[in-house]
Regions:
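Residue positions within transmembrane alpha-helices of multi-pass solute transporters
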Residues: 5, 9, 37, 70, ...
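Hydrophobic transmembrane alpha-helices of multi-pass small-molecule transport proteins
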Residues: 115-136
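Extracytoplasmic gate region of multi-pass secondary transporters
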Residues: 159, 163-171, 175
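Short, solvent-exposed interaction modules
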Residues: 60-76, 215
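Membrane-interface interhelical linkers
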Residues: 1, 5, 9-15, 21-25, ...
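Helix-helix packing/entry segments at the starts of transmembrane helices
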Residues: 22-27, 74-100, 185-186
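Hydrophobic/aromatic residues within the transmembrane alpha-helices of Major Facilitator Superfamily
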Residues: 1-5, 33, 66, 93, ...
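C-terminal transmembrane-helix exit sites in multi-pass transporters
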Residues: 91, 97-117
Length: 215
């Protein structure tokens, strides 16, 4: 329930920032601050030099945050083109299919689970639902008519791969650091830094307009 609300709010914010990257930066920065406060209250020991000196830095410290950037920014690009409902459905479909692949093959250190007929039937129902939603969608919510909607559906499906991979990576980091809240903080911090750099490169401004721009 919260995902489409978050996406809609961030999409609205991007109309004032004039940049999807900038809107995502603000979203990640707020999340980072909240997680930092939680870590200070619940696990202050994870923020000490002694704790960091005992850790082994690897891809789990970086990749999770970058995948979060891809997913959040991707949703901001998709929402004005597909609408909230179809954006959520197509990305969730990608999440479920990637989640099934990770479980079936035990990728990224995940516990391997066998593929069942029920999972297959569920995926078929999801794809059928997307087809019906696209079929009855006679009036596009945007003016991007030059690009076929199938293209954006495919992009949304691929963007949906990011969250289950990110969750698996962050889970591994949480096991190594013995703190899921700290793992989330690292993920958000990396995402915030990456988005801030992208904002400076592509937007070249940190101004927020008082009037919004219709996407």
């Amino acid at each position: 329930m919260l995902l489409p609300i978050q996406t809609s709010i961030n999409s609205r914010l991007s109309q004032f920032t004039r940049s999807s990257f900038y809107a995502s930066t603000i979203s990640f920065a707020v999340g980072t601050i909240c997680l930092l406060v939680l870590n200070i209250i619940i696990h202050p020991q994870v923020l000490t030099p002694e704790f960091f000196s005992k850790q082994t830095l690897n891809y789990t410290w970086v990749l999770g945050g970058l995948l979060g950037v891809i997913y959040l920014t991707g949703n901001l690009l998709l929402l004005p083109r597909l609408g909230a409902a179809l954006t959520v459905v197509i990305t969730v479909t990608g999440q479920i299919i990637m989640g099934v692949i990770i479980d079936t093959f035990g990728l990224l250190g995940a516990h391997q689970q066998s593929f069942t007929i029920f999972k297959g039937v569920g995926i078929i129902f999801l794809i059928t639902g997307i087809i019906f939603m696209n079929y009855v969608r006679r009036h596009p919510v945007n003016r991007h008519k030059n690009t076929p909607i199938v293209f954006w559906l495919l992009i949304g499906f691929v963007f949906g791969f990011a969250p289950p991979i990110q969750t698996t990576i962050n889970s591994t980091l949480a096991q190594h650091t013995h703190s899921s809240i700290f793992a989330s903080l690292i993920s958000f911090s990396v995402g915030t830094i990456a988005l801030f750099i992208l904002t400076l490169v592509f937007n070249r401004s940190l101004k927020i307009s008082s009037t919004h721009k219709t996407l």
